[in-house]
Amino acid sequence: MLPRPSSRFLSTQRGPGRAVKKLIAIGEKWKQKTTRGPPKQGTLNNRSKYILCQFPYPSGVLHIGHLRVYVISDSLNRFYKQRGYNVIHPMGWDAFGLPAENAAIERGINPAIWTRDNIAKMKQQMESMLANFDWDREVTTCDPEYYKFTQWIFLKLFENGLAYRKEAEINWDPVDKTVLANEQVDAQGRSWRSGAIVEKKQLKQWFLGITKFAPKLRKHLNQLKDWPSNVKQMQKNWIGESIGAELVFKVADSKFENLIVFTTRPETLFAVQYVALALDHPIVQKYSEVIPDLKEFLQKSDQLPSDTKEGFRLPDIKAVNPLTKEELPIFAAPYVISSYGTAPSAVMGCPGHDSRDFEFWQQNCPGEHIKTCIAPFFDDASKTSEKERQKIIDTVPFTSADGILTKESGEYSGVFTAVARKSIMGKLHSKGLSKNIIRYRIRDWLISRQRYWGTPIPIIHCDNCGPVPVPESDLPVKLPELKGLDTKGNPLSTIDEFVNVACPSCGSPAKRETDTMDTFIDSSWYYFRFLDPKNTSKPFDREIASEHMPVDIYIGGVEHAILHLLYSRFIAKFLGSINAWDDPTGIFEPFRKLVTQGMVQGKTYVDPDSGKFLTPDELTFVKDPSDGNTTIIKSNGKIPMVSYEKMSKSKHNGADPNECILRHGADATRAHILFQSPIADALNWDESKIVGIERWLQKVLCLTKNILGLEKNLAISKDYKTPTDLNDAEVKFHNDFQRFLKSITESFEVHLSLNTVISDYMKLTNLLESALKKSEVRKEMMVQNLQKLVTIIYPAVPSISEEAAELISSQMEWNQYRWPEVERTTESKFKKFQIVVNGRVKFMYTADKDFLKSGRDAVIETLLKLPEGRMYLMNKKIKKFVMKYNVISFLFHK
């Protein structure tokens, strides 16, 4: 009889009963060891593995989304350590930024104090979830020891002509009173943080020349094989590569130089009807000084929707088509992207062959004729009817890039578009009126912020010398300490002792730059600093960075696809270009494999009548025998509408991970969040389903006690190998175990399918439990495979693994952290043979799989010794006898 399972580990559904409290206590018992102690880093051929999750902003509270990222990261960290890698798994704090500054204003304190308090709270929360980080590598971006080197990177950019200051139209957040980069304004024209409608202003600002790296940023995306395709596509779209031509349109007014107009379709020149200029184009700016209506149009342009087709026709000025010599009207048009490429932005308008140009022409020149110069081409094999053909021909605009030029195209009439494009470019090029070019939509990175809580820009403005870089020996330029902040905006400009300095170049009185840097600069290089965090002379050692970069696995949200990830790629490539690190591939990409986890969504309850989002206090949760739990609205007795949506305070659907850990324990919470959904998918958070995880964890502990209780003095060597003389049950047990072990190992190493890891853990536990009940597998094999189970659950549920390992270690010596190798599956030495008499199976006989090789006489003799053999075979005259595969067939004379 099997030992009775300990009642301490029996499941309960009534709150945190004794068994669940035991799980919680186990997490507390092993917290110190699992977060700070073993396993030691391996020495597997000195291979390293750099696993990094995006470091958080220290708000003071970890939400479920944080928990998901850190559990994924920590599980991979533990797995690779068990596999023998020297794992780098650091954590730090993205500590500068508006939230800290705004919170400090509300509380009347220095943001540094608020930030430090929050970091302490969040470190405790990370430990409560048993996260094992390399705290000796911890960095905080608001520490002068860190931002000293953020300033050093800025100076290197400045030295290489990639940091510059110019007056530009900028995005102004009227709530937070600061400048926003283009990437920080959403499609509705709102600030990414405050949600305010963004205004346009002209200010002198600092920019970083990311556009110089646009070709490499675009090209190298194709080499990032382990990045999600949607992230790469978003970056491709943002970089916006356009292969086209710059055409010279002369201006029929000698006061202005020629217009450089960009187009991707020079074959449409015969149908061009206007030229559109960006609002910051020099011609537009010049005319705005003398035309009040244009000035007013420019001032109100920031209030127009992003897809506006409004335009302002410039009077008394025409552009000359370089091919047809026709004079064309010129418009100021908000849809033209400012500074599109190297030349001021100008595009040609072709209403007959471009949908946007068509809408613009209809709005600004209603009723005027629309020209076309390209028609669709139908070959003889086309099955398109004449009626359908005419309908296509009459459709305006005709936007296909493939077609045939019409009679309006003069000498090019009847020529295919691709041929005409090449010929037209050659003709214009011979006259000095065109050149092939690749342009990019991306614009230089605006980094100036008019706020206090950020990295000071290390520049001094001198009337004699202009912008002068702060000498490296004077870094860091420290933020002056403030007792408290009482207003939004930039307080640095009001602090005389900070602003007024001597020029480092000529010694004259000068003023320090009072803008601080965009916080995305801080996070654009932190993965380098983690590798050498105590270095006081440089950001990081070149050899150390070259050895461990790029990051092997980088985990974080897809919401950073354009901002953080693009900026990090730019800075990594720049640092490579100045020989700060070496990449044998030559592409200097910072992240080899990118893992973007799905959003965690909360259960949302809505009143079907009013549409109101309901709080838990407004609901009654009752048990329904027919279909489980039912939720009822207290006020009207109705059943609410239920859905899963992004967690928010307004929808009352948030979840506190700390409360979940307090109710169920860290291990159950970790396994639950891994089990609920594949990493890339949205996770619908439902805490009620965690009971299945709790039962499994209790089963693991109970199973450990029961297997060890088979024989008190049972002990096996730590070098114990799977026996070769396995019976059928042992063969099946061994093969099933190896199949699950292989699946789990590959789920970590190859597929990153951590939800199936938890599922396979459960199946392995059930496999051991079933074998224990049947008593068909020898005790030594049971213990050996129990050890393996306890070892491989360590990445996901470390304290349960430690608890079970402690029970095992009390009876025998073993290496509880070394990941087991997958063994070959085996075949049974025995085979079941069908004994067929006159065409019918009479009985089965199990024998050595080589039984038939003993020969006819030996086989018959053996079978006749069996009771069934004597019954069906004795005293019969054999007419025909066949032995084949697993069949022994007798045909007797009647």
Curated annotation (Swiss-Prot):
Residues 1-9 form a transit peptide. It comes from the Eukaryota. InterPro entries: aa-tRNA-synth_I_CS (IPR001412), aa-tRNA-synth_Ia (IPR002300), Leu-tRNA-ligase (IPR002302), Leu_tRNA-synth_edit (IPR025709), Methionyl/Leucyl_tRNA_Synth (IPR015413), Rossmann-like_a/b/a_fold (IPR014729), tRNAsynth_Ia_anticodon-bd (IPR009080), Val/Leu/Ile-tRNA-synth_edit (IPR009008). PROSITE patterns: AA_TRNA_LIGASE_I. GO terms for biological process: leucyl-tRNA aminoacylation; mitochondrial translation. It is an enzyme of class 6 (ligase). The keyword Aminoacyl-tRNA synthetase applies. One of its GO terms (molecular function) is aminoacyl-tRNA deacylase activity. ATP binds at residue 649. This is Leucine--tRNA ligase, mitochondrial. It comes from Saccharomyces paradoxus. The lineage of its organism: Eukaryota, Fungi, Dikarya, Ascomycota, Saccharomycotina. The gene is NAM2.
